[in-house]
Amino acid sequence: ESSHAQVQATLSMSKKEYIAHEPVVATVTLTNNAGRDLLIHADDRTTLNWLDFEIKNSRGTSLSPLAAMNFGPVRIPAGRSIAKSVDLTGAFRVTEPGRFRCKAVIRLPEGGGNFVTNTTYFSVTLGRQVYSQRVGDPGRGDVREYRLSIHKTPQKSSLYVHLVDIRTGQ
């Protein structure tokens, strides 16, 4: 029996558009069709995670992980589903404006095979800045800027406050 028949995996994003530096949350849903409980964990021989993400920008360039993502073992009862939500902003540079595509790779242990979820698309924008104010002492190098941005979608308008260290741009 193939791993594809044993586990069904889908990927979804918490939304389609994000403001730069806000959490980009991806959710992987795994359904166990194997007829027995499954324990999915990192491969002890290769130290590969059981879950990885592949993200490409609009030019088709793969984004390299900025940090390792470590996921503990997951038990999926027979006939049941589990969902794992992951904030991708800590592991990938998805803070710059642009359009991205993402898919998840699931590795079953003990040679159970690898498979890939559906591809989802999301974009990151700066929003429209409507106000900014610098505060602090330039002589001491501790100037910060408060920025107010609006982001509109067909469903709603959102107001964001950004606090930026002028020295670092962060």
Residue spans for each PLM region:
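Residue-identity detector for glutamine
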Residues: 6-8, 129, 133, 155, ...
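Low-complexity, Pro/Ser/Thr- and charge-rich linker/hinge segments at domain boundaries
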Residues: 119-145
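Short peripheral tails and domain-boundary helices/loops at the edges of structured domains
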Residues: 106-115, 126-128
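Short beta-strand elements that form the blades of beta-propeller/WD-repeat-like
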Residues: 138-164
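Contiguous segments within soluble domain cores/interaction surfaces
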Residues: 6-11, 17-19, 23-89, 97-107, ...
